A protein has these predicted regions:
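Acidic, surface-exposed loops and disordered segments
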Residues: 1-223
Length: 223
């Protein structure tokens, strides 16, 4: 793949909260997971497992579990109409494949474990975009209030980590243009000075602007 093609795919990947009711083929789900399993992982331990949920009753129960933690401001559980949920799990037993000193120290090996899962999750979203599908992160599934109940619901082994969930389907709307920081403001070569980075005021200004953009996007997705 050429760089320009990769960049176009990355730009195409956007979080969408409104989906068409049309089901997506099992083949598309398998293609998403096939891409994800090629993601990099620490010493190739491949800690991931994937739970695919299509059953309406199960999806409704996942939504109810999500709501138990309280709705986010202006962001109700609007992922509920997606035809497929894909939950990414991490199997901590795979840490045994790391070097012994690293495998024995959870404080040191957990970042490797999390980074491996993060890579697979990003690959899932890029694969969905390449297939013309819309996707949305639902990280709430990994929070302490939800993990135990979700594991019970789906028969997930107790020791596993619920990393994240992607909801996926055909987009019902077109994504808005994304608000991005200027590239030249975020690249630093070699040792940098404090003045090379944004001031507190600049960070706050962008945070306010991107929050406004995000809330407008969420509101549009729900209309």
């Amino acid at each position: 793949m050429e760089y320009d093609s990769l960049l176009e795919l990355v730009k195409k990947r956007r979080s969408i909260r409104r989906f068409k009711p049309d089901p997506i083929p099992d083949e598309s789900v398998e293609k998403i997971i096939d891409v994800a399993r090629w993601a990099p992982s620490g010493l190739n331990i491949q800690p991931w497992e994937f739970v695919v949920v299509k059953d309406r009753e199960l999806k409704d129960r996942i939504v109810k579990l999500s709501e138990a933690g309280g709705p986010l401001p202006r962001d109700p559980m609007d992922f509920s109409n997606a035809p497929v949920y894909i939950i990414l799990l991490g199997d901590p037993r795979t840490k045994a494949g790391l070097p012994p000193r690293l495998a024995a120290n959870n404080e040191m090996n957990q970042p490797v474990f999390n980074s491996s899962l993060a890579s697979a999750f990003l690959y899932m979203h890029l694969a969905a975009a390449a297939l013309g599908l819309a996707s949305q992160w639902m990280s709430r599934v990994g929070l302490p209030f939800m993990q135990p109940e979700l594991k019970k619901l789906l028969g997930i082994p107790e020791g596993f980590q619920v990393y994240d969930m992607m909801v996926v389907g055909y987009p019902a709307i077109k994504a808005r243009e994304k608000l991005l920081r200027p590239k030249d403001k975020m690249i630093h070569y070699g040792a940098a000075e404090k003045d090379d980075f944004r001031t507190d005021e600049e960070v706050e200004d962008f945070a306010n602007r991107t929050r406004t953009w995000a809330m407008a996007t969420i509101g549009r997705d729900k209309d």
